[in-house]
Each structure stands twice: as C-alpha cells, then as structure tokens.
C-alpha cells in the first residue's frame, strides 16, 4: 500500500532480533553494530572486540514471536561464547520460536549447535555470512572471522545433517558474488541473499579505520558496486531461484521492497 514504510536491514529477514553480548571478537571493519556502539558510547573502537555478556539477557525467558527471530544481529557466535550461546538459543527454541541463526561460522560452533538441537531442525534456519570466495579478502575486512574454507565446511556440514541452510552475501566484499553462488548453491536449501556494503566510508571512519589502505580498498569496493555493475550482476543471477536481493540492490534494479517485517523475500 502506498505510504507504508519499507523494511530494510535485519527486518527483511525477521520480525525481531535477539542478542546477549556487547562487542564482537570478529571485529569486522564495516560493522554497523560497532558503529552504533561507538556512537552511543557503549563501546570504543579499541575495546569492541572484547565481548561482555549481558547476564540478564542471557537468562531471559522468551515468548513465541509472530514470525522468525534473528539471532544474533549485533554480535556473532564464537567458540569462546558458545556455552552461553547454547543456553540462549535453547531459551529461544523452547518457547516455540523459529530462529534464523546468522553467523560467520566456526566449525566448532556449527557442529555443537547441530548436535545439541537436532530435534529442532524444523525451527532453525542457518544463514552463513560469506561475502567473498577469497580468504584474503575476508581476512582484510573481517580480521578475526573464519576463512572461506571453514565457512564452506560449516555449510556442507549443516546441509548434510538435515538443517535448513542459506547464505548472506551482504556485504559483498568484492565483485565475485556469482562465484559464491556457483560454488555453494548445491548446499543451500533456502536462499542466497546478496547486498551491497552500505554507508561504508562513514562506518569505517566511526570505527576508527581511516588509514590509507583501508580507505582505498573501500573506494575500490564502492566502485565494484556501481549501479551499472549491480545491474549486470542482477542480469546474470536473476534466473537463479535461490538468489534473493537485499534492499540495497532492489533499489538499483527497481524491485519492489517489502513493507512487512520478516517475510524473507
């Protein structure tokens, strides 16, 4: 309906978000949550990678939401916080919720979640963030997150163990999203989401990353995501039924943007 507010970000995927940690060890350079934490003085650029568990949130008893809940949205799941993650995820699931587990996956983490929650396969959808097929690119932008091979191993493991799987290629970290689709689509039961790097220079500056190398790579990445190149990518992948487009791409190619939270379309 005309005048209704378009949804973007995590609300394209879920009706609400759930988190229990302030900070993130992965310390991704482009991180929106880091930018917000610094802006509102909850963290600094220097201590963002030090994770602090919110024990009240960790022990929260959830109600059943009217749609999928994304977990986590402002931090990630690592081997260090895995024991607490199991508690928190269990609290979400026992309330009957459908949970979208979004992570730059560590194999130890995915293996543990799959074995612990094997009876909840119909309530969990994994969404593994993979912005490049090149581990060197991943290492630059996501310095403490797993390399490409480990992320692929996690996807294959979850798929082979009967879990629903999907990929977030948002942000794209180079101009090779089509190679990610080609290499991983056979292990995806749900969808492969593709999106641009949003507000990249602004976020890098807020996150304290203004060195010459980072800014140059950021400008190179922005150039890779010009409207012309996005339209070409869309043309090449639009016939693939597993590929979905984030709001940042939909604007460029003039696709309708949802006004309803959590439709995952």
Task: Label the model's feature ranges.
Residues 228-265:
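C-terminal accessory regions of radical SAM enzymes
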Residues 53-236:
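Conserved AdoMet/S-adenosylmethionine-binding subsite of the radical SAM
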Residues 13, 43, 73-76, 103, ...:
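Generic ordered-secondary-structure signal
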Residues 1-68, 252:
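N-terminal [4Fe-4S]-dependent radical SAM core
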């Amino acid at each position: 309906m005309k005048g209704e507010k378009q949804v973007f970000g995590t609300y394209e995927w879920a009706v609400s978000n759930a988190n229990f940690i302030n900070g993130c060890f992965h310390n991704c350079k482009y991180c929106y949550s880091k930018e917000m934490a610094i802006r509102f003085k909850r963290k600094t650029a220097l201590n963002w990678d030090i994770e602090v568990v919110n024990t009240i949130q960790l022990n929260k008893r959830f109600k059943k939401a009217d749609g999928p809940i994304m977990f986590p949205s402002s931090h990630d799941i690592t081997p260090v916080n895995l024991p607490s993650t199991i508690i928190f995820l269990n609290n979400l699931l026992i309330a009957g919720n459908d949970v979208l587990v979004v992570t730059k996956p560590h194999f130890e983490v995915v293996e543990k979640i799959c074995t612990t929650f094997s009876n909840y396969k119909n309530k969990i959808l994994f969404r593994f963030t993979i912005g490049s097929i090149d581990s060197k690119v991943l290492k630059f932008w996501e310095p403490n997150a797993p390399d490409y091979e480990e992320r692929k191993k996690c996807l294959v493991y979850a798929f082979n163990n009967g879990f629903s799987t999907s990929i977030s290629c948002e942000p794209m970290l180079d101009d090779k999203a089509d190679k990610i689709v080609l290499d991983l689509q056979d292990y995806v039961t749900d969808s492969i989401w593709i999106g641009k790097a949003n507000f990249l220079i602004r976020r890098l500056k807020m996150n304290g990353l203004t060195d010459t190398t980072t800014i140059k790579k950021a400008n190179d990445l922005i150039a890779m995501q010009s409207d012309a190149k996005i339209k070409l990518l869309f043309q090449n992948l639009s016939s693939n039924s597993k590929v979905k487009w984030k709001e940042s791409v939909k604007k460029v190619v003039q696709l309708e943007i949802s006004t309803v939270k959590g439709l995952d379309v």
